[in-house]
Amino acid sequence: MEIEILGQEDNPLLHRTDVQFKIVHDDATPSRLSVRDSLAAKLDKDSEEVVVHELDTKFGMRKTRGRAKVYDSPAQAAEVEHDHMLERNKIGADDADAEEAE
């Protein structure tokens, strides 16, 4: 899986960078978590700071376009993002599991 950054736009008010990217893959569309981890590695960020919002693969193509938001810290992501986006990206899931266990 190859990731190419198509564009970045800083949003200092929300302490994040909006990123548009393209993925070239050999098999099926990669999972949101594998894209998040690969994108975080490419941007030299922690995977908890990256929230993948959209993955769009055209029928029969081995290319996927997507959008992600890269925050300055996981706390900023948890404060700004909707709960369902945090669940999809498995951000803060370990904390919630620990609270439920107690």
Swiss-Prot record:
One of its GO terms (biological process) is translation. Pfam families: Ribosomal_S24e. Gene3D superfamilies: 3.30.70.330. Keywords: Ribonucleoprotein, Ribosomal protein. GO terms for molecular function: structural constituent of ribosome. Residues 70-102 are annotated as: Disordered. One of its GO terms (cellular component) is ribonucleoprotein complex. Residues 79-93 have a biased composition (Basic and acidic residues). Belongs to the eukaryotic ribosomal protein eS24 family. HAMAP family: Ribosomal_eS24 (MF_00545). This is Small ribosomal subunit protein eS24. It comes from Halobacterium salinarum (strain ATCC 700922 / JCM 11081 / NRC-1) (Halobacterium halobium). The gene is rps24e.
